[in-house]
């Protein structure tokens, strides 16, 4: 009987141990299932993250390709802008050279005009001398005739110089018109270049690559354009000054022309008087 009780107790203990072990295994199984589910969720989450990363990578590559293409286009635009700036510098240099030549011609015309004015003054002096001379003897008449010939020569020389001055003034006016046209063309080109550079600058602001360098180059171009605009304004001011000088010279030429006409009329009267005097002397 004791053996049976001991055996029953041993079996009960074995049963309890088996139950405990079963509970432990069941708990471990549940935990394993939970870990498996958690692992599967993590795998699915990682797959989603991997897909998102791949999508973001594709998008980033597309953006990089687009940015690279835009950067290449902007580099081409900058190269073209640099070419335009160089061409504009050359045009301004040519304009300044044309203005310098115009100023030289204007100075020459001024000198010629001064010579013509001096000749007219000399003619007036000779006329007064002729009027004050006595026509009483043949010797004085000969001297008067020689002086009259000299006065006529001076008048003809003044006419020739006046024609030369008029021709030079016409050339100066033509040069000034061409200079003004070039100045207007240069100003229009600057406006176009400023618009192109403004568009390039706005596009470069959207790029994250080389943004600082692009901004610096944009400021440099703006400074260059500002300098070119100032040069054009100075050239236009010089052209306006030259035009005003030409207008003043034209007025002076008109005045001298009127004086020459009057002098010619006076010379004609003196010649008529001399002819009459010669006739009277011949009659004696």
Curated annotation (Swiss-Prot):
Domain-level remarks: The molecule is in a coiled coil structure that is formed by 2 polypeptide chains. The sequence exhibits a prominent seven-residues periodicity.
N-acetylmethionine modified-residue sites: 1
Keyword Coiled coil in annotation: yes
Subunit-level organization: Homodimer.
GO MF terms, alphabetically ordered: protein homodimerization activity
Disulfide bonds: none
Regions annotated as coiled coil: 1-284
Gene giving rise to this polypeptide: TM1
Tissue specificity: Expressed in leg muscle and chest protection muscle (at protein level).
Region span, Disordered: 1-49, 103-126
Keyword Glycoprotein: no
Keywords, alphabetical: Acetylation, Allergen, Coiled coil, Repeat
Family named by the database record: Belongs to the tropomyosin family.
Gene3D superfamilies noted in UniProt: 1.20.5.170, 1.20.5.340
Pfam families, alphabetized: Tropomyosin (PF00261)
Function of the molecule: Tropomyosin, in association with the troponin complex, plays a central role in the calcium dependent regulation of muscle contraction.
Bias kind Basic and acidic residues: ranges: 12-45
Protein's UniProt name: Tropomyosin
């Amino acid at each position: 009987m004791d053996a049976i009780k001991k055996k029953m107790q041993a079996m009960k203990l074995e049963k309890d141990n088996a139950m405990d072990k079963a509970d432990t295994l069941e708990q471990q199984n549940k935990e394993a299932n939970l870990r498996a589910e958690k692992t599967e969720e993590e795998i699915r989450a990682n797959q989603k993250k991997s897909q998102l990363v791949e999508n973001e990578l594709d998008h980033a590559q597309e953006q990089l390709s687009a940015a690279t293409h835009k950067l290449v286009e902007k580099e081409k635009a900058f190269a073209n802008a640099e070419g335009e700036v160089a061409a504009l510098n050359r045009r301004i240099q040519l304009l300044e050279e044309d203005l310098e030549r115009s100023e030289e011609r204007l100075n020459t015309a001024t000198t010629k005009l001064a010579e013509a004015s001096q000749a007219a003054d000399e003619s007036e002096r000779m006329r007064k001398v002729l009027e004050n001379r006595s026509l009483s003897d043949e010797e004085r008449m000969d001297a008067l005739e020689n002086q009259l010939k000299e006065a006529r020569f001076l008048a003809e020389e003044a006419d020739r110089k006046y024609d030369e001055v008029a021709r030079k003034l016409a050339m100066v006016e033509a040069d000034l018109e061409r200079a003004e046209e070039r100045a207007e063309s240069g100003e229009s080109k600057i406006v176009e270049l400023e618009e192109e550079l403004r568009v390039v600058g706005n596009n470069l602001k959207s790029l994250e690559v080389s943004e600082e360098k692009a901004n610096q180059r944009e400021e440099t171009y703006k400074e260059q354009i500002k300098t070119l605009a100032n040069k054009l304004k100075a050239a236009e001011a010089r052209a306006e000054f030259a035009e005003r000088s030409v207008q003043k010279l034209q007025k002076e030429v008109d005045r001298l022309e009127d004086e020459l006409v009057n002098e010619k009329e006076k010379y004609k009267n003196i010649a008529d008087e001399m002819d009459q005097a010669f006739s009277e002397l011949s009659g004696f």
